[in-house]
């Protein structure tokens, strides 16, 4: 099998040495680890299709992988030593960038940061943004329907996509690549593959939407009394800023404390602490003065008791420093010790009640555990993370993983929410899907999987 794969992609693109493949075989949290037969890196859609055709004929299972930044184990092989990791890192070309149509067609291995730079090269803006953007890839972003910090204004990855090129399990290449904003010719196959996590086909390229480059961007860090006050502030800023509101991130005091403790070169923007914080970003497309707008809104918010205090970044460096206080929360938690994490969403108006009830349940069941709920309040996506008690044994704390998951996921369901807001299902949440998904929807999903991947070679053991 290895010889036939080498004949397709070249021997240098087939990696078998364990010291090389190990970096592909472990996901970022260390929850899942596998042993692949090999890692293969095709450099074109044609090579990738030939690989899939060969694997399909020989019933060899394939695990597609982009930047290996996924957080639910969707990109990780099992321990059989028989699965192939199909890395898309060499499919990294920009096929077309069109500032007139406001589109760009990129291959799946382009990193998100590179995609943003391609947009900037023609004075356009690609709004998908997240902490892993230097490593995560467009293919992975689309396979998981990634969210990030600007969903409030632009939607998730699905809403930024006009068309796809997808390698199917039997080696055929499906293309819906198009710069058209209107096309009613049949079923929308593009959206079928977005969020399918490589179980229905392997995304090899995508046509993505571009937007006008914002004239200016302003960042504020706001001190708050509670999530309820944060909700009032969100509604107030929405009404005043309209579509200029790009991000509204909720941060508890413990999260800020952990960042200040564990991340070098960070500092508290306020002279005294607050129980909660919000990071706000506005970026009008028109040549309005965003600083004046944000100053006016926050001044009025403080007067009307929607906020306690606020600071607006006075430079690009300070804006970056404020964003770092949000983006390094997960890393700070990791350095603090054990952390049990949840990527959930609930209706925005119910976020304060959810945080309150979740906190009560955690304290009743694990009295010394420390909830750290933070995230994209503007779109209802919370990362409800729980850090270990001070001085606790990490292994003993993490042994409560399943119990804590049951508590948070049940409450999420009670609130009409989702157990996976933006990270996907992968291996981590596969067993939960039958508990939360409509039975008819599950039946349709299984039928689609059987039709598109009859031999079950595409990312088995993931999602469905």
What are these regions (language model features)?
Residues 1-53, 70-102, 255-267, 318-340, ...:
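N-terminal flexible segment immediately upstream of the FAD-binding catalytic core
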Residues 1-28, 58-60, 301-317, 414-419, ...:
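N-terminal accessory segments
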Residues 3-14, 57-60, 117-124, 147, ...:
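Generic secondary-structure signature for well-ordered alpha-helical cores
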Residues 16-23, 221-224, 231-398, 404-407, ...:
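C-terminal substrate-recognition/cap domain of FAD-linked oxidoreductases
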Residues 66-68, 91, 131, 253, ...:
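Short, ordered loop/turn segments at secondary-structure junctions
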Residues 93-247, 458:
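FAD-binding subdomain of flavoenzyme oxidoreductases
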Residues 172, 430-464:
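Activity-critical C-terminal alpha-helical subdomain
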